[in-house]
């Protein structure tokens, strides 16, 4: 206390902290000790022998949910605890369900593999290159077959360039038949004024290109009887509009018509010699 002359002021000073304090404890005032914390039980992994697994799989094939009596009987047989048998069946059922879920995926993958193999085989048969193969590999099976079929359908198969005529008696019938099949009847059409188109065709002859030029009507008859080129020859025989001029038929592409140079077309003149019109 502080005293003055007239009054006394009480002291504000506090006494020291001198009473004992117990240490912090966790369990009823006992000091903290790590050994007093309850330890979590560790799971023990069980290793099964091959014989034990065979017995368990046999029972699982019979039933997935064995009763307690079956589990105890198997536990005595394989010398394990009944709780271990129960845990094994629980894990085995989970594995079985997972396998059942994966079955549709595997079946789909197998079907896709079969489809891809079939598609590759059809691509090879169609003449298309295999997937993943070299880009330069281009089989020509399909194109060759299509070209052959198209040629047969259109009748454009190539014919031999030279067919030697056979004059023997044994081959007369066959040669006449082939000539009759390849020969066409002459078709005369009138195209325009004074223009006659004569289309003639006959059998194929090896000497058609090198045929000699006939000079008389008898030689023309003999030549016409012989087979000529298979392609149709168009002859444009223009009559002499002005007979007094006289057209030179020997300059035509077909020399067999040279006879007409001696016998011009007997046409009627358009005017008389004195210059008067008709």
From Swiss-Prot:
It is found in: Nucleus; Chromosome, Telomere. Gene3D superfamilies: Homeodomain-like (1.10.10.60). GO terms for cellular component: chromosome, telomeric region; nucleus. The keyword DNA-binding applies. GO terms for molecular function: DNA binding, bending; DNA-binding transcription factor activity, RNA polymerase II-specific; double-stranded telomeric DNA binding; RNA polymerase II cis-regulatory region sequence-specific DNA binding; telomeric DNA binding. The N-terminal and homeobox regions are together sufficient to bind telomeric DNA. This is Homeobox protein ceh-37.
């Amino acid at each position: 206390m502080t005293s003055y002359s007239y009054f006394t002021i009480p002291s504000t000073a506090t006494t020291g902290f001198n009473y004992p304090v117990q240490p912090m404890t966790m369990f009823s005032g006992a000091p903290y000790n790590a050994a007093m914390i309850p330890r979590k039980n560790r799971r023990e992994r069980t290793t099964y022998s091959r014989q034990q697994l065979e017995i368990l799989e046999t029972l699982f094939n019979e039933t997935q949910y064995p009763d307690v009596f079956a589990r105890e009987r198997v536990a005595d047989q394989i010398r394990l605890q009944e709780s271990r048998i129960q845990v094994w069946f629980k894990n085995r059922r989970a594995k079985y369900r997972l396998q059942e879920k994966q079955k549709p995926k595997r079946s789909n993958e197998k079907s896709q593999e079969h489809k891809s193999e079939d598609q590759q085989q059809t691509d090879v048969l169609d003449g298309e290159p295999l997937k993943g193969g070299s880009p330069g590999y281009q089989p020509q099976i399909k194109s060759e077959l299509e070209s052959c079929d198209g040629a047969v359908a259109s009748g454009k198969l190539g014919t031999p360039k030279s067919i030697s005529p056979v004059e023997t008696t044994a081959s007369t019938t066959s040669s006449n038949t082939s000539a009759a099949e390849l020969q066409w009847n002459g078709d005369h059409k009138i195209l325009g004024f004074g223009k006659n188109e004569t289309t003639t065709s006959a059998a194929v002859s090896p000497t058609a290109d090198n045929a000699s030029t006939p000079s008389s009507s008898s030689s023309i008859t003999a030549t016409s009887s012989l087979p000529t080129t298979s392609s149709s020859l168009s002859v444009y025989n223009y009559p002499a509009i002005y007979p007094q001029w006289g057209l030179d038929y020997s300059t035509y592409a077909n020399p067999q018509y040279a006879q007409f140079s001696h016998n011009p077309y007997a046409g009627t003149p358009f005017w008389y010699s004195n210059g008067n019109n008709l």
